[in-house]
């Protein structure tokens, strides 16, 4: 036969009246208000024999803990005791007097008068309604669109639909649908695309480069004459260069070279080649160009060695120039 154990409320009253558990005492015995020590196990100075004595006694009373058989688990003891206190219909917590923090943390409870049979029945019916509503809400939350679609697909439909289809009004329905539906214009899709070009304005790097196009005018007859005069003056400039340069042939240790000394004679430098002044002609540059071309042609055909000997044979060494001996 199972052993009947004492219910929590009378067992708790007996523990309070015994004064064996430290911190468990009446605050107001007339109003049945009492306090339970509720110190957190993580705080400094927490003792299992002092702060968890009530929870351990309840675990031993319910048979969930036996000394020597299981290791002490004060955390589980306290959780089980709290759940049992919250499940009691005739005990409620006085939250405005409870202290949940610190080393002197306590919870204050009040014992209510015992319930009658009618009150117990009402309480049970209310709890049953609450549980039913909770299960319904849970089922509604679990239902998904997939389950609804499965339920709809599971319903079978008859193969013969003639029993609930009005055959006489089929043509009228079609005519009404045609009248209601607006006439839609046919959609024509053309594969040809109109040619388009992206307009792009090419700007210069700087605005200072913007110049208008200018066309040079044709040269006049006077300007053309000046150009011909300039071409005729070119040979005269060349002759002046020959006259200004005064190179004299000389030699040092049997080696000849040309020397540019002031006062030298053109005949000694150029030898037998000389240019005679021609009378001025109305068309400048005509005969002068022919004479210069003749001189250069004779110089080109003549042997350069003979030309140098001719130049050096007629020259004398000036007394002002001294030979510089080469270092050994």
Curated annotation (Swiss-Prot):
Location(s) in or outside the cell: Nucleus; Cytoplasm
Pfam families for this protein: IRF
SUPFAM superfamilies from the UniProt entry: Winged helix' DNA-binding domain (SSF46785)
Biased amino acid composition, Low complexity: 141-157
Regulation of protein activity: Activated by MYD88.
One Gene Ontology term from the biological process aspect of the record: apoptotic process
DNA-binding region: 5-113
Record keywords: Acetylation, Activator, Antiviral defense, Cytoplasm, DNA-binding, Immunity, Innate immunity, Isopeptide bond, Nucleus, Phosphoprotein, Repressor, Transcription, Transcription regulation, Ubl conjugation
GO terms, molecular function: DNA binding; DNA-binding transcription activator activity, RNA polymerase II-specific; DNA-binding transcription factor activity; DNA-binding transcription factor activity, RNA polymerase II-specific; RNA polymerase II cis-regulatory region sequence-specific DNA binding; RNA polymerase II transcription regulatory region sequence-specific DNA binding; sequence-specific DNA binding; transcription cis-regulatory region binding
Modified residues (N6-acetyllysine): 78
Processing and modification events after translation: Phosphorylated by CK2 and this positively regulates its activity. Sumoylation represses the transcriptional activity and displays enhanced resistance to protein degradation. Sumoylated by UBE2I/UBC9 and SUMO1. Inactivates the tumor suppressor activity. Elevated levels in tumor cells. Major site is Lys-276. Sumoylation is enhanced by PIAS3. Desumoylated by SENP1 in tumor cells and appears to compete with ubiquitination on C-terminal sites.
Chief location of this protein within or outside the cell: nucleus
Chain residue numbers at which the record places covalent cross-link Glycyl lysine isopeptide (Lys-Gly) (interchain with G-Cter in SUMO): 276, 300
Tree of life domain: Eukaryota
Gene Ontology, cellular component aspect: chromatin; cytoplasm; nucleus
Keyword Transcription regulation in annotation: yes
Family as reported in the entry's similarity comment: Belongs to the IRF family.
Purpose of the protein: Transcriptional regulator which displays a remarkable functional diversity in the regulation of cellular responses. Regulates transcription of IFN and IFN-inducible genes, host response to viral and bacterial infections, regulation of many genes expressed during hematopoiesis, inflammation, immune responses and cell proliferation and differentiation, regulation of the cell cycle and induction of growth arrest and programmed cell death following DNA damage.
Assembly mode: Monomer. Homodimer. Interacts with EP300. Interacts with MYD88. Interacts with PIAS3. Interacts with SPOP.
Protein name: Interferon regulatory factor 1
Source organism per UniProt: Rattus norvegicus (Rat)
Taxonomic lineage: Eukaryota, Metazoa, Chordata, Craniata, Vertebrata
Gene assigned in the entry: Irf1
